[in-house]
């Protein structure tokens, strides 16, 4: 790996809470293919974390979110990926503007589909950074207090 080419990037991932469930989609990607992951993506120049969260969720799922709160930041290095990469991932908690709204798969080339999963019964396999975060005892429902 040439570290001169691998520059860390900032990603924003979103824990959308709906009752006792979170929204997850099965990835179609060279990194973490077929694992379950949160909606999210790259922070664009000049964007706030909240703006990025709202934009990415809308682009990927068609959902409108609100009451966004910064939860945690993780450092994820994918040395074994076909193209090694390094992401600083900012985790945001949010809720739906309209709780009756259902997710749509707006980017089928990147995701097999979105669904709500009960916090006590999450699907496997989870995307490695998410598995690592949950393994540390992280809980998006209680971390950082209430809104």
UniProtKB/Swiss-Prot annotation:
Expressed in roots, stems and leaves. This is Nudix hydrolase 1. The keyword Nucleotide-binding does not apply. CDD domains: NUDIX_MTH2_Nudt15. Mediates the hydrolysis of some nucleoside diphosphate derivatives. Its substrate specificity is unclear. In vitro, it can use NTP, dNTP, 8-oxo-GTP, 8-oxo-dGTP, dGTP, dATP, dTTP or dihydroneopterin triphosphate (DHNTP) as substrate. Has some NADH pyrophosphatase activity in vitro; however, such activity may not be relevant in vivo due to the high concentration of manganese used during the experiments. Plays an important role in protection against oxidative DNA and RNA damage by removing oxidatively damaged form of guanine. Keywords: Acetylation, Cytoplasm, Hydrolase, Magnesium, Manganese, Metal-binding, NAD. Has the ability to complement a mutation of mutT in E.coli and thereby completely suppress the increased frequency of spontaneous mutations. It comes from the Eukaryota. The gene is NUDT1.
